[in-house]
Amino acid sequence: MGINDNGIYGSLKGNSTTGGIYKMGDHNTGYGEKNNQNNNNKSGGKTIVNGVIVNSNQQKLKGDENEFDHSQDDNADEFNKFPKKVKYNDLLYSVLFAIQMVLFITMTVIAGTKHPNKKEFVEYSLQGLLIIAISIPLILAFFLIWKKIFKIHPTNMIKTSFFSLMITGILFIGLLIGNGWYSWAIVFGITLISLIFFYFAFRDKIPFVGIIISLVLKIIEKYPSTLLVSFVCLIISCVYYNIWLFSVSYNFYYDSYWTAWSYMKFMFLVFNLYWTHYVITYTCYSVVSGLVASWYFFADEDFNGMPPKPCAHSLYRSMTSSFGSIAFGSLLVCLVQMVQFICRGFARVPGLTSLFCNCLQFIALIFTRMLYTFNIYTFSMVSIYGQSFCNSSKKTYNLMVNNNEKLFATHNYMLITMLSVSLSMFLIIGFIVTMIMATIQLENQGWLYVQLVMFLFILYKPFDIIFSSVLTILMCLISDPNAMEVTKPNTFILLSETYDFKSLNP
């Protein structure tokens, strides 16, 4: 069983896919269910579980026989080494993304050569880097403290997160009423009531979510490279955002009035911003999902059996065979958000046009969030099975339709937990960073606010990878719960006490 450049590992002989784990729905993974005696037969120092030979250090997929001689297999390369030729999925969208990035760089360089004052931009960019330098150590320290507490009291931490978010919501609604913003108070009041209803309707899922988050924290502790990947993506994002601001400012520096060409350039820059942002975000998700899926299908409770350098291999797959799929999925979200952006502009025109555009903008906003969330699940499937975006989307849709209640409960508990923790971090660390920057007395306070927005991206990054990791484990459990039963039986028993695996519909 060899790691595949398109998916987590190569397909079995007779059940070939496009380079992924297995054909979903067939469950021909060789894992199989344990019999009444757990099928723990010993043979030559190996444990045989319904045709699956499990060494102390590595799990190997087998067929119905106790041994499988790869030397007699015509497709032995599938099991033992990387394929000689990588299959690039959705290659067209990789090319399109590269073309629009070349256009963006060209526009930026041309604008920069014409602008008389580049020193000002460099000074402001250094201020942003200063905020990043101050923020990251504080965030990592806060995250490590939270991680240690959560590993000890996972269920209580989730409950505490809910109640703290509820209290914050009540205080915020009171603030809105005090300032006379009654319409917004009604909106947030309805949201708060929905949150309370959700908590009491699905509170029986809290122990399961707590166990999953604890498993993810264990993986991150074992492979801190996941955090490194996350912060590298963050740094790339911050550098790109500064360059984008440079390009927007300097492209329109001399424009006393806007022509049709000016509007076209501006729309392209907005399009470039959205598409690049989502590509960076989903690439990070894909890398982390690939590592977590490797842990799910290969490793035991002590991480024995993990392939070498799983994070590096997952990064390689995300930047090669899966990058076209990432660019394709990101483009879809980008296009919907462009519709929202255009409607926001036309909504400023008074009359019926404003009302229509506001309604359309609201619909586009909801659809953007739905598509963004759907893509997170889809890219987990892309990382696991190495298939194209369309094929992965179809499988993701079927899994979500057949298991909507479990996905809904787990997703929202995870999201609200991360939101409440991030909110508390923002209040504490944001106050510290603001005080430090105030004592430095920056010349341009407006630019400070722009950099504080970037600070929000830094704040959420450690929890971003936890969120994507939890969703990946959930997708793996729905796809093939028997895999965990074989590789991690103790964890499977623990999860079975809080989760009805028989009700899953892969």
Swiss-Prot record:
Entry keyword annotation includes Glycoprotein: yes
Q: Which residue positions carry a glycan here? A: N15, N41
Q: Which GO terms describe its biological process?
A: transmembrane transport
Q: Where are the transmembrane segments?
A: 91-111, 126-146, 161-181, 182-202, 226-246, 256-276, 279-299, 323-343, 345-367, 371-393, 416-436, 447-467
Q: Name one GO cellular component term.
A: membrane
Q: Which UniProt keywords apply?
A: Glycoprotein, Membrane, Transmembrane, Transmembrane helix
Q: Does the keyword Nucleotidyltransferase apply?
A: no
Q: Where is the protein situated, by its record's location annotation? A: Membrane
The molecular function GO annotations come to: transmembrane transporter activity
According to Swiss-Prot or TrEMBL, what is its membrane topology? Answer: Multi-pass membrane protein
Matches recorded under InterPro entries? Choline_transptr-like
Q: What protein family does this chain belong to?
A: Belongs to the CTL (choline transporter-like) family.
Please give the name of this protein: CTL-like protein DDB_G0269978
This chain's source organism reads Dictyostelium discoideum (Social amoeba)
